[in-house]
Amino acid sequence: MFDIKNNGVFMNLENYKISTLPYIDNASNEIMKKYNIKAQYETEPPHGDAIYSISIKGKALPFWIYGRDVTFIGNSMVMVESVRCKTWDPIETMFIDLENEVYAGLKEWYTDILFFNNRIELTNQVVKMKNLIINKFDELKWIDF
């Protein structure tokens, strides 16, 4: 059995509630307020869906995010659909650890997250691809922001 840890804390449904903002535009929650997360509208691709630059605690992140389906995991982790600045594709799923001020890219785009047998499973309902299972957040390549 695998236990997912984030900063030494076991991840499970009891201590890692998942919540999603359908759209970040004009939205806020306790986590966004606590970490001073600001979203600035930047552009909109031909297919719709606004794209935003993001700052956390006054620090601008080196990528933009789609405003849709911003997923909060526990009290300090966020999963977003990111793109390079001034673009709208390719889309890459990014985890942002707000407490430790780091982020990790997954090199692919995943639309959905769920806990499954004490692991995280990421899937994509838009594009047919393999699911990704994460056993430990510590195994991701984290970059400071």
Residue spans for each PLM region:
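Short amphipathic beta-strand/extended segments with alternating polar/hydrophobic composition
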Residues: 59-68, 105-109, 129-138
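Surface-exposed, interaction-prone regions used to assemble/regulate multi-protein complexes
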Residues: 52-54, 93, 106, 111-112
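Terminal domain-start segments
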Residues: 1-62, 144
